[in-house]
Amino acid sequence: MLESEYRYDTQLLIERTDTDLDEDEIHDYLMNEIPGDCLIAVGDEDLIKIHYHTNTPWKVLEYCSSLGDIYDVVVENMERQEHGLKG
């Protein structure tokens, strides 16, 4: 059984394009606007690493891509992984 009620492990990097990135602002937005848990948002004004468990990874990607360039995107289905399948 999953430890989290959220199915998708969503990970990515956001690179600043025009405006400085603020990890606290990003953290607060994700926690308040996109249901999930196990959020990590760390970095500096140029680059932020996101790790978040959610059922709506597309919303995380949409928000993060509005802040800068996103890359190294990984979305894994933890439910499948729990059953020994590729996530």
Functional labels for PLM-detected ranges:
Residues 1-87:
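N-terminal loops that bind phosphate or other acidic moieties
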